[in-house]
Regions:
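A conserved beta-strand-loop-helix scaffold within acyl/acetyltransferase catalytic domains
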Residues: 10-153
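Conserved acetyl-CoA-binding loop-helix of GNAT-fold acetyltransferases
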Residues: 1, 152-167
Length: 180
């Protein structure tokens, strides 16, 4: 006898703006939808920029003023930078939060054009990293880390990482980016 059955519908596989987003409810399933943000990337950069809130635009501009931004993908994988990303996770959390194997998988995805790593450099040190995974012209903001001990600036860096990913995926003509 089945007491519980869980089914997930990935929001990136559905038609956006559709009334039929959770068709399982017609069969008695409970709607336990996630709350997420999905960016449609099939617009010009100018149009994408126009959708961003004023405060976020300010944060992006401030981040660019202070930080050098780097993107690593299949064309320029850098194991050393990926290791810095992994070690920063360990340092910031104060413990090992996930196995080495998961980081090795992320690096393999990077080499196989299934992910990118974004890094922010300030005052001669890497201060933040963000990992985005992708498949079939759709991308997901997967993981990020910022080292507050290294920050001599009070600028939210997440907005700059997300905007960098938007630009990257827009240039590659991706359809969607889920940012959580």
């Amino acid at each position: 006898k089945v007491l519980k059955y869980k089914v997930m519908i990935d929001p990136l596989t559905q038609k956006l703006d559709s009334e039929q987003y959770n068709w399982l409810m017609r069969y008695g399933y409970i709607d336990a939808s996630i709350n997420t943000n999905i960016i449609k990337l099939k617009e010009t950069k100018e149009m994408l920029w126009s959708h961003i809130k004023k405060g976020h635009k300010h944060n992006i501009k401030q981040g660019r003023k202070y930080c050098k931004v780097a993107v690593w993908d299949y064309s320029n994988p850098d194991y050393e930078k990926h290791e810095l990303y992994r070690l920063m996770h360990h340092k910031v959390s104060g413990r090992i939060t996930r196995s080495l194997k998961t980081f090795e998988l992320q690096y393999d995805w990077l080499k196989n054009d299934e992910a990118i790593l974004i890094g922010l450099f300030f005052d001669n040190k890497w201060i933040a990293f963000g990992c985005f995974v992708h498949l079939n012209k759709k991308a997901i903001y997967s993981s990020s880390v910022q080292n507050p001990e290294e920050l001599d600036i009070s600028v939210p860096l997440g907005h700059l990482m997300i905007w960098t990913a938007i630009e990257y995926y827009n240039n590659r003509e991706f359809d969607l980016l889920e940012i959580g």
